[in-house]
Swiss-Prot record:
The active site is at K148 (proton acceptor). Signal peptide: none annotated. InterPro entries: NA-bd_OB-fold, RNA_methyltr_RlmE, RNA_MeTrfase_FtsJ_dom, rRNA-MeTfrase_E, SAM-dependent_MTases_sf, TRAM_dom. S-adenosyl-L-methionine binds at G50, W52, D69, D85, D108. This is Ribosomal RNA large subunit methyltransferase E. PANTHER family: PRE-RRNA 2'-O-RIBOSE RNA METHYLTRANSFERASE FTSJ3 (PTHR10920:SF13), RIBOSOMAL RNA METHYLTRANSFERASE (PTHR10920).
Length: 256
């Protein structure tokens, strides 16, 4: 990124009272991907110094915002902060003492850089993996997730892992990031609480009909719409798409 552009975001952050130029990155992410809505409960992992907390509070319009970090975060009006390890069950319990459920988990944390690119990339993916695991413990069904990673040979597999746990996964390079920076944001939308995944083959019995004519089956109380199914059919089906509250499937084999 040219120095002039870099200084633009740095100076703008100072003028607007943001603690970090990274505040603009979350604004750009949300403008395009709508991960935070009015009234949402947001948890920021690795939140110090608090630039993303400030923006999250603006975006969620009165919803709760909680920041977690090993470092102390200077107070922000309307924001709860927890000094603790995000992986600790005690820290996670403290979050649930404040809120019943979490709509969005965000993480702009980065590892301490060594100057060894391969090592820094691996540490970045490891940190993002920890954030993903914590997010799956906090998020409600249909919740959203965004995390920063450094691109490298482990990057694509990480994006795939996010895709397994959310109904939609994508990546975003913020215009507020330095042009030469390898940082990129991985976004997951529609957190999946079911164990079903696209491509799974399962045996079901159609027990109802949907309004559009698809058969309805239940797998561990999760609704699956089966194209061409009729009530009473015993079928082997293949999952074609999974949403937070239901899935779609095609018939592989019908029991005779």
């Amino acid at each position: 990124m040219p120095a002039k552009k870099r200084d633009h975001y740095y100076n703008k952050a100072k003028q607007m009272g943001y603690r970090s130029r990274a505040s603009f990155k979350l604004q750009f992410i949300n403008k395009k991907h709508h991960i935070i809505k009015k009234g949402d409960t947001v948890v920021d992992l690795g939140a110090a110094p608090g630039g993303w907390l400030q923006v999250a509070k603006e975006l969620n319009g009165g919803g709760k915002v909680i920041g977690v970090d090993l470092q102390r975060i200077e107070p922000i009006e309307g924001v709860e902060t927890i000094k603790g390890d995000m992986t600790s069950p005690e820290t996670q319990a403290r979050i649930f003492e404040i809120v019943d459920e979490v709509d969005t988990v965000i993480c702009d944390a980065a590892p301490n850089l060594s100057g060894n690119w391969a090592l820094d990339h691996a540490r970045s993916i490891d940190l993002a993996t920890v954030a993903l695991d914590v997010a799956t413990k906090l998020l409600k069904k249909g919740g959203n997730f965004v995390v920063k990673v450094f691109q490298g040979d482990l990057y694509e597999n990480y994006v795939k892992e996010v895709g397994k746990r959310f109904s939609y996964a994508t990546t975003y390079k913020s215009q507020a990031s330095r042009q030469q920076s390898a940082e990129i944001y991985v976004i997951g939308k529609g957190f999946l609480t079911t164990s079903l995944r696209k491509g799974d083959v399962v045996d079901v019995t159609i027990d109802a009909m949907g309004k559009t004519g698809d058969g309805i089956a239940h797998v561990d109380d999760f609704v699956v719409f089966v194209k061409g199914g009729s009530v009473g059919d015993k079928l082997k089906i293949k999952i074609t798409d999974v949403k937070p509250s239901f899935a779609f499937a095609d018939i592989v084999e019908k029991e005779k």
